[in-house]
C-alpha cells in the first residue's frame, strides 16, 4: 500500500523555492537510508541528516514523549550567525499536505483511497 509522506509534494515546489532560498529536508535517518528512501519516492530535492545531533529537539520538532514532529523552519544568515526567522509545525488539514485538499474537492472526498487510514500521519505529530 502506498502511504502519503509529507515530503511527497516537495518536488513540485522545490524548483520554485530555490529561486529565493536554499531548500533541504532534514531527517533523523543516516544518509544511506535517506538516499534509498528518497529514491523509492522519486524525490529530487536535497536531504540532510540530523542523526546523532540535537537539531530536531533544538528546533522543537521532538514531542515530550520523544517522537518526531514534522515541521518547517526558515533560516537567514546574518554575518557569522544563522538565525531562525520563522517556523511552523505540520498538522492534519494544513496547507503543507495539499493532496488532501484536492481529495476533499472530489465527489465522496477522500473516500476509499488506500492512504485514508493514515491521513493524520501525513502531517501530524507522532
Regions inferred by a protein language model and the residue ranges of each:
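Non-globular targeting/processing and membrane-anchoring segments
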Residues: 1-20, 35-40, 46, 54-126
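Short His-Asn-centered micro-motif
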Residues: 23-29, 34, 50
